[in-house]
Amino acid sequence: KNDHQLEIKKIIKKNIVGIKKLSSERLLDELKKTFKSNCFIKLCEIDFSYEIICAVFPEFKQIELFRKLNDYTKNNLYSLDFTFFLSILILDKTDNSDYFFYKFNISKKKQKRIKLIKEFFFSKKQSTKLNAQNLRKISYFNGKEGLVDILNYKIFTSKKFDKNLINQINYFKNKE
């Protein structure tokens, strides 16, 4: 892993405006390629690359999470889909996700998945307890995919690793 030369860093930073002028579809497509190539975590660990990603995608309010993932989340991030990956990056208590949907033209189906996670964790109306009764209720109203997204989001955003959440995911995935 070679560090970028200082002169190259200056040139890239100087021309970052050109990257920002690319179409939102192209930027999202390039991000998807980066995610599928399994190198996003490595890029976040390199300070210069992290700085560039933050400059190109200022909507990624939770990108800091990728600098301090536990072993389980590092090993399992790429087994999850791109929509869930986006939810980790953009969800917070603000309307940041709505702006992201507007700017990047995300499909209604994908928006619904991301909004479900946001509603569960950031809405004051709902209980965020992940007890058996609440999980069954989520599964009934939002399906297995919604439930698994909520559990995975909890795993990826928690400071401590909770094996019980993994067991819950496996239980509901195997349940009809």
Regions found by a protein language model. Give the residues of each.
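Catalytic core of bacterial c-di-GMP phosphodiesterases, primarily the EAL and HD-GYP domains
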Residues: 40
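Divalent-cation-assisted or electrostatically stabilized phosphate/pyrophosphate-binding catalytic cores
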Residues: 20-21, 25-29
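C-terminal subdomains that position terminal phosphate/3'-OH groups for nucleotidyl transfer/ligation
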Residues: 14, 46-176
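Conserved phosphate-binding loops in nucleotide/dinucleotide-binding enzymes
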Residues: 28-36
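Internal alpha/beta core interface subdomains
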Residues: 1-19
